[in-house]
Amino acid sequence: HTDFFTSIGHMTDLINTEKDLVISKLKDYIKAEESKLEQIKKWAEKLDKLTDTATKDPEGFLGHPANAFKLMKRLNTEWGELESLVLKDMSDGFISNMTIQRQFFPNDEDQTGARKALLRLQDTYNLDTDTLSRGNLPGVKHKSFLTAEDCFELGKIRYTEADYYHTELWMEQALKQLDEGEVSSADKVYILDYLSYAVYQQGDLSKAMMLTKRLLELDPEHQRANGNMKYFEYIMAKEKEANKSSTDAEDQTDKETEVKKKDYLPERRKYEMLCRGEGLKMTPRRQKRLFCRYYDGNRNPRYILGPVKQEDEWDKPRIVRFLDIISDEEIETVKELAKPRLSRATVHDPETGKLTTAHYRVSKSAWLSGYESPVVSRINTRIQDLTGLDVSTAEELQVANYGVGGQYEPHFDFGRKDEPDAFKELGTGNRIATWLFYMSDVSAGGATVFPEVGASVWPKKGTAVFWYNLFPSGEGDYSTRHAACPVLVGNKWVSNKWLHERGQEFRRPCTLSELE
Protein backbone atom coordinates (compact mmCIF):
# COMPACT_ATOMS: atom_id res chain seq x y z
CA HIS A 1 0.00 0.00 0.00
CA THR A 2 1.05 3.62 -0.52
CA ASP A 3 -0.49 6.94 0.57
CA PHE A 4 -1.68 5.50 3.89
CA PHE A 5 -2.72 8.95 5.12
CA THR A 6 -5.46 9.14 2.45
CA SER A 7 -7.52 6.25 3.91
CA ILE A 8 -8.43 5.48 7.53
CA GLY A 9 -9.46 2.01 6.32
CA HIS A 10 -5.92 1.23 5.23
CA MET A 11 -4.44 2.83 8.33
CA THR A 12 -6.26 0.24 10.48
CA ASP A 13 -3.94 -2.37 8.94
CA LEU A 14 -0.99 -0.41 10.34
CA ILE A 15 -2.38 -0.68 13.87
CA ASN A 16 -2.49 -4.47 13.56
CA THR A 17 1.04 -4.50 12.12
CA GLU A 18 2.32 -2.37 14.98
CA LYS A 19 0.57 -4.56 17.55
CA ASP A 20 2.18 -7.66 16.03
CA LEU A 21 5.61 -6.01 16.20
CA VAL A 22 5.14 -5.04 19.85
CA ILE A 23 3.46 -8.23 21.10
CA SER A 24 5.45 -10.93 19.35
CA LYS A 25 8.62 -9.41 17.94
CA LEU A 26 9.68 -6.64 20.32
CA LYS A 27 8.69 -8.51 23.49
CA ASP A 28 10.54 -11.63 22.31
CA TYR A 29 13.62 -9.50 21.75
CA ILE A 30 13.30 -7.94 25.22
CA LYS A 31 12.99 -11.42 26.80
CA ALA A 32 16.10 -12.59 24.95
CA GLU A 33 18.08 -9.55 26.10
CA GLU A 34 16.83 -9.95 29.68
CA SER A 35 17.79 -13.65 29.66
CA LYS A 36 21.26 -12.77 28.40
CA LEU A 37 21.65 -10.05 31.02
CA GLU A 38 20.44 -12.41 33.76
CA GLN A 39 23.15 -14.94 32.82
CA ILE A 40 25.82 -12.23 32.95
CA LYS A 41 24.52 -10.99 36.33
CA LYS A 42 24.65 -14.51 37.82
CA TRP A 43 28.21 -14.93 36.52
CA ALA A 44 29.21 -11.58 38.02
CA GLU A 45 27.62 -12.39 41.41
CA LYS A 46 29.34 -15.79 41.54
CA LEU A 47 32.74 -14.30 40.69
CA ASP A 48 32.23 -11.43 43.12
CA LYS A 49 31.91 -13.86 46.03
CA LEU A 50 34.74 -16.07 44.75
CA THR A 51 37.26 -13.27 44.19
CA ASP A 52 36.32 -11.67 47.51
CA THR A 53 37.28 -14.90 49.30
CA ALA A 54 40.35 -15.52 47.14
CA THR A 55 41.89 -12.06 47.56
CA LYS A 56 41.77 -12.27 51.37
CA ASP A 57 44.22 -15.22 51.36
CA PRO A 58 45.52 -15.83 47.83
CA GLU A 59 48.18 -18.40 48.80
CA GLY A 60 45.88 -20.33 51.07
CA PHE A 61 43.11 -20.26 48.44
CA LEU A 62 45.38 -21.55 45.69
CA GLY A 63 46.85 -24.11 48.06
CA HIS A 64 43.80 -26.17 47.29
CA PRO A 65 44.55 -27.89 43.92
CA ALA A 66 40.91 -27.71 42.83
CA ASN A 67 40.92 -23.90 43.19
CA ALA A 68 44.13 -23.67 41.17
CA PHE A 69 42.61 -25.84 38.43
CA LYS A 70 39.35 -23.84 38.38
CA LEU A 71 41.26 -20.53 38.14
CA MET A 72 43.11 -21.80 35.07
CA LYS A 73 39.85 -23.06 33.58
CA ARG A 74 37.97 -19.80 34.25
CA LEU A 75 40.60 -17.56 32.75
CA ASN A 76 41.32 -19.79 29.79
CA THR A 77 37.80 -21.00 28.90
CA GLU A 78 34.95 -19.48 30.89
CA TRP A 79 35.90 -15.83 30.41
CA GLY A 80 36.03 -16.55 26.70
CA GLU A 81 32.51 -18.00 26.89
CA LEU A 82 31.36 -14.89 28.74
CA GLU A 83 32.92 -12.71 26.07
CA SER A 84 31.01 -14.66 23.41
CA LEU A 85 27.78 -14.24 25.38
CA VAL A 86 28.31 -10.48 25.71
CA LEU A 87 29.08 -10.19 22.01
CA LYS A 88 26.10 -12.33 21.01
CA ASP A 89 23.61 -10.12 19.14
CA MET A 90 20.09 -10.95 20.31
CA SER A 91 18.57 -8.43 17.90
CA ASP A 92 19.08 -10.42 14.68
CA GLY A 93 15.56 -11.91 14.62
CA PHE A 94 13.93 -8.62 15.57
CA ILE A 95 15.92 -6.63 13.01
CA SER A 96 15.16 -9.08 10.19
CA ASN A 97 11.44 -8.89 11.04
CA MET A 98 11.62 -5.10 11.19
CA THR A 99 13.34 -4.96 7.81
CA ILE A 100 10.53 -7.02 6.25
CA GLN A 101 7.76 -5.01 7.94
CA ARG A 102 9.28 -1.61 7.17
CA GLN A 103 8.67 -2.21 3.47
CA PHE A 104 4.98 -1.74 4.28
CA PHE A 105 5.40 1.20 6.69
CA PRO A 106 4.28 4.76 5.91
CA ASN A 107 6.90 7.02 4.36
CA ASP A 108 7.81 10.71 4.60
CA GLU A 109 4.93 11.61 2.28
CA ASP A 110 2.48 9.95 4.66
CA GLN A 111 3.88 11.79 7.66
CA THR A 112 3.76 15.11 5.79
CA GLY A 113 0.21 14.34 4.63
CA ALA A 114 -0.91 13.64 8.20
CA ARG A 115 0.77 16.83 9.45
CA LYS A 116 -0.93 18.91 6.77
CA ALA A 117 -4.25 17.24 7.61
CA LEU A 118 -4.01 18.44 11.22
CA LEU A 119 -3.28 21.97 10.03
CA ARG A 120 -6.13 21.80 7.51
CA LEU A 121 -8.53 20.77 10.28
CA GLN A 122 -7.30 23.65 12.41
CA ASP A 123 -8.07 26.15 9.63
CA THR A 124 -11.37 24.69 8.48
CA TYR A 125 -12.90 24.25 11.92
CA ASN A 126 -11.30 27.28 13.62
CA LEU A 127 -9.59 25.15 16.26
CA ASP A 128 -7.07 26.74 18.60
CA THR A 129 -3.74 25.01 19.11
CA ASP A 130 -4.48 24.12 22.74
CA THR A 131 -7.70 22.32 21.74
CA LEU A 132 -5.84 20.25 19.15
CA SER A 133 -2.87 19.60 21.41
CA ARG A 134 -5.03 18.49 24.35
CA GLY A 135 -7.18 16.34 22.06
CA ASN A 136 -10.41 18.07 23.10
CA LEU A 137 -12.32 17.30 19.90
CA PRO A 138 -16.06 16.61 19.69
CA GLY A 139 -17.12 12.97 19.68
CA VAL A 140 -13.68 11.47 20.35
CA LYS A 141 -13.58 8.01 21.95
CA HIS A 142 -9.82 7.82 22.45
CA LYS A 143 -8.25 11.07 23.59
CA SER A 144 -4.77 11.76 22.27
CA PHE A 145 -2.30 14.49 23.18
CA LEU A 146 0.29 16.25 21.06
CA THR A 147 3.72 16.55 22.65
CA ALA A 148 5.77 19.74 22.63
CA GLU A 149 7.89 18.09 19.94
CA ASP A 150 4.76 17.46 17.83
CA CYS A 151 3.71 21.11 18.20
CA PHE A 152 7.23 22.24 17.23
CA GLU A 153 7.09 20.04 14.12
CA LEU A 154 3.72 21.51 13.07
CA GLY A 155 5.08 25.01 13.65
CA LYS A 156 8.06 24.26 11.39
CA ILE A 157 5.72 23.13 8.59
CA ARG A 158 3.92 26.48 8.80
CA TYR A 159 7.27 28.27 8.91
CA THR A 160 8.46 26.66 5.67
CA GLU A 161 5.21 27.85 4.06
CA ALA A 162 5.89 31.41 5.33
CA ASP A 163 2.68 31.22 7.38
CA TYR A 164 4.07 33.13 10.35
CA TYR A 165 0.72 33.55 12.08
CA HIS A 166 0.26 29.80 12.54
CA THR A 167 4.00 29.35 13.17
CA GLU A 168 3.61 31.66 16.17
CA LEU A 169 0.58 29.74 17.48
CA TRP A 170 2.25 26.32 17.32
CA MET A 171 5.62 27.48 18.67
CA GLU A 172 3.86 29.21 21.58
CA GLN A 173 1.96 25.99 22.29
CA ALA A 174 5.22 24.00 22.31
CA LEU A 175 6.82 26.57 24.63
CA LYS A 176 3.78 26.59 26.92
CA GLN A 177 3.90 22.81 27.32
CA LEU A 178 7.62 22.88 28.11
CA ASP A 179 7.09 25.70 30.63
CA GLU A 180 4.43 23.55 32.29
CA GLY A 181 7.08 20.90 32.90
CA GLU A 182 6.62 18.49 30.01
CA VAL A 183 9.69 16.34 29.46
CA SER A 184 10.55 16.48 25.76
CA SER A 185 13.38 16.33 23.26
CA ALA A 186 12.17 19.69 21.93
CA ASP A 187 14.64 22.47 22.74
CA LYS A 188 13.41 25.82 24.09
CA VAL A 189 16.25 27.61 22.30
CA TYR A 190 15.15 26.28 18.90
CA ILE A 191 11.51 27.07 19.65
CA LEU A 192 12.29 30.64 20.73
CA ASP A 193 14.44 31.13 17.63
CA TYR A 194 11.54 30.25 15.30
CA LEU A 195 8.98 32.03 17.46
CA SER A 196 10.83 35.34 17.70
CA TYR A 197 11.34 35.46 13.93
CA ALA A 198 7.69 34.60 13.23
CA VAL A 199 6.56 37.36 15.59
CA TYR A 200 8.97 39.84 13.99
CA GLN A 201 7.66 38.97 10.51
CA GLN A 202 4.19 39.95 11.71
CA GLY A 203 5.43 43.35 12.89
CA ASP A 204 5.43 42.88 16.68
CA LEU A 205 8.95 44.14 17.33
CA SER A 206 8.70 44.51 21.11
CA LYS A 207 7.49 40.92 21.53
CA ALA A 208 10.22 39.68 19.17
CA MET A 209 12.82 41.46 21.35
CA MET A 210 11.35 40.00 24.53
CA LEU A 211 11.49 36.47 23.11
CA THR A 212 15.05 36.99 21.83
CA LYS A 213 16.14 38.18 25.29
CA ARG A 214 14.68 35.02 26.78
CA LEU A 215 16.57 32.95 24.19
CA LEU A 216 19.85 34.70 25.06
CA GLU A 217 19.30 33.99 28.76
CA LEU A 218 19.29 30.29 27.86
CA ASP A 219 22.13 30.51 25.31
CA PRO A 220 24.14 33.77 25.57
CA GLU A 221 26.45 32.70 22.72
CA HIS A 222 23.65 32.13 20.17
CA GLN A 223 24.99 33.93 17.09
CA ARG A 224 21.73 34.52 15.21
CA ALA A 225 19.92 35.71 18.33
CA ASN A 226 22.71 38.17 19.14
CA GLY A 227 22.61 39.46 15.57
CA ASN A 228 18.82 39.72 15.63
CA MET A 229 18.92 41.60 18.93
CA LYS A 230 21.25 44.23 17.50
CA TYR A 231 19.04 44.58 14.44
CA PHE A 232 15.86 44.87 16.54
CA GLU A 233 17.49 47.58 18.69
CA TYR A 234 18.52 49.44 15.52
CA ILE A 235 14.96 49.27 14.15
CA MET A 236 13.56 50.39 17.51
CA ALA A 237 15.87 53.40 17.54
CA LYS A 238 14.76 54.33 14.03
CA GLU A 239 11.14 54.06 15.17
CA LYS A 240 11.70 56.54 17.94
CA GLU A 241 13.35 58.97 15.55
CA ALA A 242 10.74 58.80 12.83
CA ASN A 243 7.83 58.01 15.17
CA LYS A 244 6.79 55.52 12.55
CA SER A 245 7.73 51.89 12.28
CA SER A 246 8.76 50.59 8.92
CA THR A 247 7.85 47.20 10.32
CA ASP A 248 4.29 48.42 10.93
CA ALA A 249 4.17 49.63 7.34
CA GLU A 250 5.29 46.22 6.13
CA ASP A 251 2.73 44.63 8.41
CA GLN A 252 0.00 46.86 6.98
CA THR A 253 1.05 45.87 3.46
CA ASP A 254 0.92 42.21 4.46
CA LYS A 255 -2.53 42.72 5.93
CA GLU A 256 -3.77 44.47 2.80
CA THR A 257 -2.37 41.63 0.68
CA GLU A 258 -4.03 39.12 2.97
CA VAL A 259 -7.37 40.90 2.68
CA LYS A 260 -7.02 40.95 -1.09
CA LYS A 261 -6.27 37.24 -1.10
CA LYS A 262 -9.30 36.53 1.07
CA ASP A 263 -11.53 38.67 -1.13
CA TYR A 264 -10.13 36.85 -4.12
CA LEU A 265 -11.17 33.49 -2.63
CA PRO A 266 -14.69 34.01 -1.28
CA GLU A 267 -15.58 30.41 -2.10
CA ARG A 268 -12.96 29.15 0.34
CA ARG A 269 -14.54 31.13 3.18
CA LYS A 270 -18.02 29.93 2.25
CA TYR A 271 -16.79 26.35 2.07
CA GLU A 272 -15.16 26.50 5.52
CA MET A 273 -18.21 28.19 7.07
CA LEU A 274 -20.49 25.50 5.65
CA CYS A 275 -18.18 22.79 6.98
CA ARG A 276 -18.52 24.33 10.45
CA GLY A 277 -22.30 24.36 10.16
CA GLU A 278 -22.44 28.14 9.72
CA GLY A 279 -24.24 27.95 6.40
CA LEU A 280 -27.12 29.85 4.92
CA LYS A 281 -30.29 29.59 6.95
CA MET A 282 -33.34 29.10 4.77
CA THR A 283 -36.22 31.52 5.16
CA PRO A 284 -39.43 30.02 6.58
CA ARG A 285 -41.02 30.53 3.17
CA ARG A 286 -38.35 28.39 1.48
CA GLN A 287 -38.45 25.79 4.22
CA LYS A 288 -42.16 25.30 3.56
CA ARG A 289 -41.24 24.01 0.11
CA LEU A 290 -39.25 21.14 1.60
CA PHE A 291 -41.17 17.95 2.35
CA CYS A 292 -40.65 14.37 3.44
CA ARG A 293 -42.62 11.58 1.83
CA TYR A 294 -42.93 7.88 1.09
CA TYR A 295 -41.65 7.50 -2.45
CA ASP A 296 -42.51 4.63 -4.80
CA GLY A 297 -40.21 5.56 -7.71
CA ASN A 298 -43.09 6.90 -9.81
CA ARG A 299 -45.20 3.76 -9.36
CA ASN A 300 -42.29 1.38 -9.76
CA PRO A 301 -43.62 -2.17 -9.18
CA ARG A 302 -40.88 -2.92 -6.65
CA TYR A 303 -41.85 0.01 -4.44
CA ILE A 304 -45.62 0.35 -4.73
CA LEU A 305 -46.22 -1.85 -1.67
CA GLY A 306 -42.97 -0.91 0.07
CA PRO A 307 -42.15 2.74 -0.67
CA VAL A 308 -38.93 4.28 0.65
CA LYS A 309 -38.55 7.31 2.88
CA GLN A 310 -37.45 10.44 1.03
CA GLU A 311 -36.66 13.93 2.34
CA ASP A 312 -35.98 17.21 0.54
CA GLU A 313 -32.58 18.57 1.63
CA TRP A 314 -32.56 21.63 -0.66
CA ASP A 315 -34.78 23.27 -3.25
CA LYS A 316 -32.44 24.80 -5.86
CA PRO A 317 -30.67 22.69 -6.90
CA ARG A 318 -33.05 19.99 -5.75
CA ILE A 319 -31.22 17.64 -3.43
CA VAL A 320 -33.14 14.71 -1.96
CA ARG A 321 -32.13 12.21 0.69
CA PHE A 322 -33.31 8.59 0.81
CA LEU A 323 -33.40 7.08 4.30
CA ASP A 324 -32.68 3.44 5.24
CA ILE A 325 -31.81 2.84 1.60
CA ILE A 326 -28.82 0.54 2.12
CA SER A 327 -28.55 -2.06 4.89
CA ASP A 328 -25.63 -2.60 7.26
CA GLU A 329 -25.02 -6.02 5.67
CA GLU A 330 -24.86 -4.48 2.19
CA ILE A 331 -22.50 -1.78 3.46
CA GLU A 332 -20.12 -4.34 4.97
CA THR A 333 -20.15 -6.38 1.75
CA VAL A 334 -19.34 -3.32 -0.35
CA LYS A 335 -16.54 -2.29 2.03
CA GLU A 336 -15.00 -5.77 2.06
CA LEU A 337 -15.08 -5.91 -1.75
CA ALA A 338 -13.49 -2.48 -2.01
CA LYS A 339 -10.80 -2.66 0.69
CA PRO A 340 -8.23 -4.77 -1.22
CA ARG A 341 -8.53 -2.44 -4.22
CA LEU A 342 -8.47 0.94 -2.52
CA SER A 343 -5.99 3.28 -4.19
CA ARG A 344 -5.40 7.02 -4.10
CA ALA A 345 -8.51 8.77 -5.44
CA THR A 346 -8.05 10.60 -8.73
CA VAL A 347 -9.62 13.56 -10.52
CA HIS A 348 -10.08 14.35 -14.20
CA ASP A 349 -7.32 16.61 -15.52
CA PRO A 350 -9.18 19.16 -17.71
CA GLU A 351 -6.11 19.64 -19.92
CA THR A 352 -5.37 15.99 -20.67
CA GLY A 353 -8.76 14.42 -19.93
CA LYS A 354 -6.91 11.73 -17.96
CA LEU A 355 -7.15 10.72 -14.31
CA THR A 356 -4.54 12.07 -11.90
CA THR A 357 -4.08 12.42 -8.13
CA ALA A 358 -4.59 15.83 -6.54
CA HIS A 359 -3.66 17.38 -3.17
CA TYR A 360 -7.22 18.67 -2.77
CA ARG A 361 -8.70 15.17 -2.82
CA VAL A 362 -7.56 13.18 0.21
CA SER A 363 -9.18 9.76 0.01
CA LYS A 364 -8.81 6.30 -1.53
CA SER A 365 -11.33 4.76 -3.86
CA ALA A 366 -12.17 1.53 -5.66
CA TRP A 367 -14.61 0.67 -8.45
CA LEU A 368 -17.12 -2.19 -8.21
CA SER A 369 -19.04 -3.72 -11.13
CA GLY A 370 -22.50 -5.21 -10.88
CA TYR A 371 -21.38 -8.62 -12.19
CA GLU A 372 -18.90 -9.03 -9.31
CA SER A 373 -21.48 -9.40 -6.59
CA PRO A 374 -25.26 -9.77 -6.34
CA VAL A 375 -25.16 -7.05 -3.68
CA VAL A 376 -23.62 -4.50 -6.08
CA SER A 377 -26.05 -5.58 -8.81
CA ARG A 378 -28.97 -5.13 -6.41
CA ILE A 379 -27.72 -1.65 -5.44
CA ASN A 380 -27.47 -0.63 -9.11
CA THR A 381 -31.03 -1.83 -9.75
CA ARG A 382 -32.25 0.12 -6.72
CA ILE A 383 -30.67 3.32 -8.03
CA GLN A 384 -32.28 2.79 -11.45
CA ASP A 385 -35.72 2.11 -9.93
CA LEU A 386 -35.70 5.17 -7.67
CA THR A 387 -34.17 7.69 -10.09
CA GLY A 388 -35.91 6.44 -13.22
CA LEU A 389 -32.56 6.69 -15.02
CA ASP A 390 -30.81 3.96 -17.01
CA VAL A 391 -27.75 2.68 -15.09
CA SER A 392 -26.40 0.63 -18.00
CA THR A 393 -24.48 3.71 -19.20
CA ALA A 394 -23.49 4.79 -15.69
CA GLU A 395 -20.01 4.48 -14.26
CA GLU A 396 -19.25 1.60 -11.92
CA LEU A 397 -20.02 2.05 -8.23
CA GLN A 398 -17.18 4.07 -6.74
CA VAL A 399 -16.39 3.34 -3.09
CA ALA A 400 -14.34 5.93 -1.20
CA ASN A 401 -12.73 5.96 2.22
CA TYR A 402 -11.38 9.25 3.52
CA GLY A 403 -8.06 9.64 5.30
CA VAL A 404 -6.69 11.91 8.03
CA GLY A 405 -8.61 15.16 7.58
CA GLY A 406 -9.98 13.52 4.40
CA GLN A 407 -11.64 15.91 1.99
CA TYR A 408 -12.49 16.75 -1.60
CA GLU A 409 -12.41 20.50 -2.20
CA PRO A 410 -15.11 22.30 -4.28
CA HIS A 411 -15.58 20.74 -7.72
CA PHE A 412 -18.15 19.91 -10.39
CA ASP A 413 -19.13 16.34 -11.14
CA PHE A 414 -20.01 17.20 -14.75
CA GLY A 415 -17.64 18.18 -17.56
CA ARG A 416 -17.90 21.86 -18.46
CA LYS A 417 -17.82 23.35 -21.96
CA ASP A 418 -14.08 24.01 -21.71
CA GLU A 419 -13.57 20.31 -20.86
CA PRO A 420 -15.04 18.62 -23.96
CA ASP A 421 -12.87 15.52 -23.53
CA ALA A 422 -13.64 14.97 -19.82
CA PHE A 423 -15.60 11.73 -20.39
CA LYS A 424 -14.82 11.13 -24.06
CA GLU A 425 -13.25 7.73 -23.36
CA LEU A 426 -16.50 6.47 -21.81
CA GLY A 427 -18.59 7.43 -24.83
CA THR A 428 -21.71 7.90 -22.69
CA GLY A 429 -21.96 11.68 -22.60
CA ASN A 430 -21.75 13.93 -19.59
CA ARG A 431 -22.60 13.08 -15.98
CA ILE A 432 -26.30 13.85 -15.77
CA ALA A 433 -26.77 13.03 -12.08
CA THR A 434 -25.01 11.94 -8.87
CA TRP A 435 -26.19 9.34 -6.35
CA LEU A 436 -24.19 9.31 -3.10
CA PHE A 437 -24.49 6.65 -0.36
CA TYR A 438 -23.29 7.42 3.17
CA MET A 439 -21.89 4.14 4.51
CA SER A 440 -20.78 5.36 7.94
CA ASP A 441 -21.65 7.92 10.56
CA VAL A 442 -19.00 10.57 11.16
CA SER A 443 -18.45 11.88 14.70
CA ALA A 444 -17.49 15.39 13.55
CA GLY A 445 -17.02 17.05 10.16
CA GLY A 446 -17.30 15.29 6.81
CA ALA A 447 -20.35 17.15 5.47
CA THR A 448 -21.14 17.45 1.75
CA VAL A 449 -21.49 21.18 1.09
CA PHE A 450 -22.61 23.29 -1.87
CA PRO A 451 -20.85 26.69 -1.56
CA GLU A 452 -22.77 28.32 -4.44
CA VAL A 453 -26.11 27.96 -2.66
CA GLY A 454 -25.10 27.52 1.00
CA ALA A 455 -26.36 23.96 1.47
CA SER A 456 -24.82 21.47 3.92
CA VAL A 457 -25.72 17.77 3.86
CA TRP A 458 -24.47 15.79 6.85
CA PRO A 459 -23.43 12.12 6.67
CA LYS A 460 -25.88 9.60 8.09
CA LYS A 461 -25.20 5.90 7.74
CA GLY A 462 -27.66 4.01 5.55
CA THR A 463 -28.89 7.09 3.68
CA ALA A 464 -28.20 8.41 0.17
CA VAL A 465 -28.51 11.79 -1.52
CA PHE A 466 -29.32 12.44 -5.17
CA TRP A 467 -29.16 15.49 -7.42
CA TYR A 468 -29.04 16.34 -11.13
CA ASN A 469 -25.81 17.89 -12.42
CA LEU A 470 -27.35 18.91 -15.76
CA PHE A 471 -30.53 20.71 -16.69
CA PRO A 472 -32.89 18.79 -19.04
CA SER A 473 -31.35 20.82 -21.89
CA GLY A 474 -27.96 19.24 -21.17
CA GLU A 475 -26.47 22.47 -19.84
CA GLY A 476 -24.45 22.16 -16.64
CA ASP A 477 -26.05 23.34 -13.40
CA TYR A 478 -23.26 25.39 -11.82
CA SER A 479 -25.10 25.57 -8.51
CA THR A 480 -24.22 21.88 -7.98
CA ARG A 481 -20.57 22.73 -7.31
CA HIS A 482 -19.90 20.83 -4.10
CA ALA A 483 -17.21 19.59 -1.73
CA ALA A 484 -16.57 16.93 0.90
CA CYS A 485 -15.50 18.68 4.12
CA PRO A 486 -12.46 17.39 6.04
CA VAL A 487 -13.27 14.59 8.48
CA LEU A 488 -12.52 16.02 11.93
CA VAL A 489 -13.25 12.89 13.99
CA GLY A 490 -14.27 9.49 12.67
CA ASN A 491 -13.98 7.27 9.62
CA LYS A 492 -15.97 8.27 6.54
CA TRP A 493 -17.06 5.70 3.95
CA VAL A 494 -19.17 6.67 0.94
CA SER A 495 -20.05 5.17 -2.41
CA ASN A 496 -21.39 7.00 -5.41
CA LYS A 497 -22.89 6.32 -8.80
CA TRP A 498 -22.43 8.80 -11.62
CA LEU A 499 -25.22 8.45 -14.18
CA HIS A 500 -24.56 9.61 -17.75
CA GLU A 501 -26.63 11.21 -20.52
CA ARG A 502 -26.78 8.27 -22.94
CA GLY A 503 -29.87 6.15 -22.39
CA GLN A 504 -31.80 8.95 -20.69
CA GLU A 505 -33.24 10.49 -23.90
CA PHE A 506 -36.76 9.25 -23.15
CA ARG A 507 -36.36 8.98 -19.39
CA ARG A 508 -35.46 12.64 -18.91
CA PRO A 509 -36.25 14.43 -22.18
CA CYS A 510 -35.53 18.06 -22.97
CA THR A 511 -38.26 20.56 -22.12
CA LEU A 512 -39.63 23.25 -24.42
CA SER A 513 -37.59 25.92 -22.65
CA GLU A 514 -33.99 26.57 -23.67
CA LEU A 515 -33.26 27.77 -20.14
CA GLU A 516 -33.94 24.38 -18.57
UniProtKB/Swiss-Prot annotation:
2-oxoglutarate binds at K492. GO terms for cellular component: endoplasmic reticulum; endoplasmic reticulum lumen. Keywords: Dioxygenase, Endoplasmic reticulum, Glycoprotein, Iron, Metal-binding, Oxidoreductase, TPR repeat, Vitamin C. Residues 393-501 form the Fe2OG dioxygenase domain. It is an enzyme of class 1 (oxidoreductase). Binds 1 Fe(2+) ion per subunit. Pfam families: 2OG-FeII_Oxy_3, P4Ha_N, TPR_P4H. Its cofactor is Fe(2+); L-ascorbate. Its EC number is 1.14.11.2. GO terms for biological process: collagen fibril organization. It catalyses: L-prolyl-[collagen] + 2-oxoglutarate + O2 = trans-4-hydroxy-L-prolyl-[collagen] + succinate + CO2. The keyword Iron applies. It is found in: Endoplasmic reticulum lumen. Fe cation binds at H411, D413, H482. TPR repeats lie at residues 189-222. PROSITE patterns: FE2OG_OXY, TPR, TPR_REGION. Glycans are attached at N97, N243. GO terms for molecular function: iron ion binding; L-ascorbic acid binding; procollagen-proline 4-dioxygenase activity. Belongs to the P4HA family. Catalyzes the post-translational formation of 4-hydroxyproline in -Xaa-Pro-Gly- sequences in collagens and other proteins. Heterotetramer of two alpha chains and two beta chains (the beta chain is the multi-functional PDI). This is Prolyl 4-hydroxylase subunit alpha-1. It comes from Gallus gallus (Chicken). The lineage of its organism: Eukaryota, Metazoa, Chordata, Craniata, Vertebrata.
